[in-house]
């Protein structure tokens, strides 16, 4: 029972960190990253379809994304979806592929992105702390129901805290890596 509580908390914290990593990947850092286009939906046969299912996305240069559609007939639809997305990047259509040149970030925009990143980090930490609280509550209920002893409860609380501290450290590590990436010119 006790191990189950810690394992469940640990798995939930891993999901929070994975979500954080996805969110951080969507922050444009002045260099090409295929995950920038993850949220782009193309209307294909009347249904919104993720861009990465309709085209291959490659990075031929440090600041260039190249979108090569599997079906050339949807090139205009992909271009339209990229224009309408909130990426702030103008697509260049050369007839067979679409190139997206990522502009250099201004210092002001870098600072804004760091602030936005801070919000993502804080919400991930809040989620991790909520998971810890849930695990602690479950452990206390188990002790009240006489499923575990008081000593086991203390050990369990310490283990839950250690897992929480590790998850928060990982969130901070992800933040420092992304901040360095954002602020490097």
Swiss-Prot record:
Q: Which GO terms describe its cellular component?
A: cytoplasm
Localization per record: Cytoplasm
Task: Please give a single GO biological process term from the UniProt record.
Answer: translational termination
Sorted alphabetically, which InterPro entries does this protein's record hold? Answer: Ribosome_recyc_fac (IPR002661), Ribosome_recyc_fac_dom (IPR023584), RRF_sf (IPR036191)
User: Record's superkingdom?
Assistant: Bacteria
Q: Which UniProt keywords apply?
A: Cytoplasm, Protein biosynthesis
Which Gene3D superfamilies does the UniProt record give?
3.30.1360.40, Ribosome-recycling factor
- The primary site where this protein sits is cytoplasm
Any single GO molecular-function term of the entry would be:
ribosomal large subunit binding
One Pfam match, given by its short name, reads RRF
| Physiological role | Responsible for the release of ribosomes from messenger RNA at the termination of protein biosynthesis. May increase the efficiency of translation by recycling ribosomes from one round of translation to another.
Indicate what this protein is called per its UniProt record.
Ribosome-recycling factor
Q: Provide the species name.
A: Lactococcus lactis subsp. cremoris (strain MG1363)
